[in-house]
Amino acid sequence: MEKPVLQTQPSMLPFFDTAHAVNLLRGIHELRAERKFFDVTLCAEGKEFHCHRTVLAAASMYFRAMFAGTLRESVMDRVVLHEVSAELLGLLVDFCYTGRVTVTHDNVDLLLKTADLFQFPSVKEACCAFLEQRLDVSNCLEIQDFAEAYACRELAASARRFVLKNIVELAKSMDFERLSWKRLLEFVSDDGLCVDKEETAYQIAVRWVKADLQHRLHYWPELLQQVRLPFVRRFYLLAHVESDPLVYLSPACLRLVSEARSFQSYEYDRHDRPGHRMRPRPSTGLAEILVVVGGCDQDCDELVTVDCYNPQTGQWRYLAEFPDHLGGGYSIAALGNDIYVTGGSDGSRLYDCVWRYNSSVNEWTEVSPMLKAREYHSSCVLKGQLYVVGSDSTERYDHTIDCWEALPPMPHPMDNCSTTACRGRLYAIGSLTGEDTMAIQCYDAESNRWSLLNSGELPPWSFAPKSVTLNGLIYFVRDDSAEVDVYNPQKNEWDKISPMTQVHVGGSVSALGGRLYVSGGYDNTFELSDVVEVYDPSSRSWSPAGRLPQPTFWHGSVSIFRQFMPLVQSTFEPIDIPEANAIHLHRHHRNQALHNHNNNVNQNHNQEVNQVH
């Protein structure tokens, strides 16, 4: 016979009334309507509001401090408030009892100020939401100032984003011309300034200065520093920027123009000396991309694919395939926004051919061959010219005349060296031929001479080392280790950074956007990898940056700028391409103005000298 199952009675029953808060608020509101249990009266502009201390203290930290502290108001039955109108105090008292308030165009400013004073954060947030919905070109600057004055961070950020997005329309208004110097500098320096091309940013800056030239001229050089002149089109830089008296009468401004010209002629190394001016605004559609060329897949089949990765979108795109058999042992380098692939072999013969990828038309063309066929060499760009370095020879390519010239070879031949340009010199890092120790040699283009550097203890030997320049430092990535060494040419010292998350045997290294990208190769488990990881010098840490389109090794990678569709289409004003005669005329006017300016300076100086005598 089965024993009966005994049912145990629960010892407790947790209960939560979801309607309790609503019912409690309703009850408090009813007590107020019935005028029961009032224990304090608030007065403003002669009008009285009968309230409950507990309700006020629960709704506002201001009133909690008033009634719970040692202030005399804590024991007073009648409290006079001088900082608020009766109408706004009534709105806040009603809010304490109902949780409701009506924000209007007429009361929003004062209501926000009052809510901020009496510490009603939710009312303040409601006012901010109302103002954010009403943002337009006519009030965005005023709302941003107002939001910052009352620590409304989200509203201030929204107003700032609105200004940056609508800067072209805003620049046509009188409010823009009255903009403070500090505020304008913030806008023009922001990456988020929404212009279709950098010329528009220049025009906006010029308009503000010329609106009050006498009082704003001294701000101009610093303001021009925030314009990304390297990305202003060449004809505009010559015919509109350099020819403007604001620019050519200022040595500081002329230096900025010279920097832009150097960048556009590929003499300026943006990786060696990065800066905000070398970074295009996203709205222009110009993006710095990572380009991966060739390599081998998992079956060791040769790839002729060319893929590009845009860090802004996190997407890969196909570019024009390499038109010929790449082979192995080739080298890749970026000269401006063009990519050069040099040499290599098919296993039986060496190549002397050189292929150039023109990013503006997405096309590969063959240029003049090297003076010597070679493989497993290294190439890099120094001062706008392409250098190819082998164990026993060096040559240089001038893209303007499509011509190669022989240079002195390294005094100490190197096997599988890696080259990079840093601080105006070319550095080759590798193992000396026949030795298993690493060495570093330096080429000075001014003296046309190589020298072997004594840089202390170098990194261990590596079969296929890779080096890249970033922020004036040379990052050295070994082929068989996750460790990364850094060489400082100024101090002639080596250091280490955090190791990579995995090894990249046969991987590739490049600099992009002020960060270091390492991709592909075989990992710690000898599996072919598609991992791309990135090193950020500011945080001194590695992080994942996506994956290659497929696992790849022995590929090349470089970074270039490539034009995509601008995010905005409107322009500040029409810009016509000047004819050649017009450019010559601009040059003549500029030279004439400089001549007149110098004459005036000399005359003033002579007058001062005569007065002294």
Swiss-Prot record:
MF term (GO), any: ubiquitin-like ligase-substrate adaptor activity
Protein's cellular compartments: Cytoplasm, Cytoskeleton, Spindle
BACK domain location: 140-242
GO cellular component: Cul3-RING ubiquitin ligase complex; cytoplasm; polar microtubule
Domain BTB: from-to ranges: 38-105
Pfam family of the protein (one): Kelch_6
SMART domains (alphabetical): BACK, BTB, Kelch
GO biological process: one example: chromosome passenger complex localization to spindle midzone
Coiled-coil ranges (or none): none
Kelch repeat positions: 289-337, 338-384, 386-424, 426-472, 474-514, 515-562
Functional summary from the UniProt entry: Substrate-specific adapter of BCR (BTB-CUL3-RBX1) E3 ubiquitin-protein ligase complex required for efficient chromosome alignment and cytokinesis. The BCR(KLHL21) E3 ubiquitin ligase complex regulates localization of the chromosomal passenger complex (CPC) from chromosomes to the spindle midzone in anaphase and mediates the ubiquitination of AURKB.
Subunit structure, as described in the record: Component of the BCR(KLHL21) E3 ubiquitin ligase complex, at least composed of cul3, klhl21 and rbx1.
Protein name: Kelch-like protein 21
Species of the source: Danio rerio (Zebrafish)
